[in-house]
Amino acid sequence: SMSGVFVSFNSSDSTEVDLYRSMPENTSYSTWGFWSLTASDAASATDSVSASVNNGFWVGGETISFSDLPTSGSASMSGAALMDVAYRHDQSGSNYGVQRYQTAADVAATFNWGSSSWSGTIAVSNFDQDNPIVSNAGFTSFSFELDPSSNTFYGADSTDILDNAWQGGASVAGQFFGDSSPEQTGGTINVNLYKSGSADTSGANDFYVAEGIYLLCISGGC
């Protein structure tokens, strides 16, 4: 069986939480919020399996078509990201020791429009600076060169090099929101940092995973 809930930020009971207020609110063409899901396999009363997600993030809006994108000029947008984090730090053997929490980051983007295509960059800063893995990997800020596909885009393997033998990177996927022109952009950001080595060596198999959303508005506000 499966059950869940899907709620916007403005209609939730979390509107006074400082972390969430870093995101744009009351936007003209988009919204974001939370989702929770519980699923269970009750095939056997003695061998049931259940899983749940609490306060995942979602973002959506009024998408525009490729023909609505400008054919010249540029645009700058800014906003924030919200992420669910899970990480394992300085552990060894069977001592899993995973910590979970939520964090935010600043996000900015520049888009350069063309007659038949466009290009862009998304930059993330002030990302989870107090996390020991993110700090050690030198990944508190990173950026993406976007790979556009019509009115949507994707960016993988951020342009930044990791420190101290950390591996991994980040990816972004998004689309434009607006009426007849791109006024906002929103989508997902994923971060995956890890090390690999002997299971008996402390820290050799540590990892950091963050998954969440971003929402940006064109200069001048939403």
Sequence positions of predicted segments:
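Mature soluble binding/inhibitory domains
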Residues: 1-222
